[in-house]
């Protein structure tokens, strides 16, 4: 039962991170198209946001392994 829960948790976290990354990158590209002179600052902010979004699936996999081993 724990393995099923761990798989579902990791899968949903990966889907959520994929959607979040798509939204962040899409809006960053929209901003770069509107204001090309701000592209450097927008790119840096985008990488920070993508890094924070990617922390969610990593943490969920760690928690899933902890739940699976109990």
From Swiss-Prot:
InterPro entries: ATP_synth_csu_bac/chlpt, ATP_synth_F0_csu, ATP_synth_F0_csu_DDCD_BS, ATP_synth_F0_csu_sf, ATPase_proteolipid_c-like_dom, F/V-ATP_Csub_sf. It comes from the Bacteria. This is ATP synthase subunit c. It comes from Limosilactobacillus fermentum (strain NBRC 3956 / LMG 18251) (Lactobacillus fermentum). The chain crosses the membrane at residues 4-24, 47-67. PROSITE patterns: ATPASE_C (PS00605). F-type ATPases have 2 components, F(1) - the catalytic core - and F(0) - the membrane proton channel. F(1) has five subunits: alpha(3), beta(3), gamma(1), delta(1), epsilon(1). F(0) has three main subunits: a(1), b(2) and c(10-14). The alpha and beta chains form an alternating ring which encloses part of the gamma chain. F(1) is attached to F(0) by a central stalk formed by the gamma and epsilon chains, while a peripheral stalk is formed by the delta and b chains. F(1)F(0) ATP synthase produces ATP from ADP in the presence of a proton or sodium gradient. F-type ATPases consist of two structural domains, F(1) containing the extramembraneous catalytic core and F(0) containing the membrane proton channel, linked together by a central stalk and a peripheral stalk. During catalysis, ATP synthesis in the catalytic domain of F(1) is coupled via a rotary mechanism of the central stalk subunits to proton translocation. Key component of the F(0) channel; it plays a direct role in translocation across the membrane. A homomeric c-ring of between 10-14 subunits forms the central stalk rotor element with the F(1) delta and epsilon subunits. It is a multi-pass membrane protein. Belongs to the ATPase C chain family. It is found in: Cell membrane.
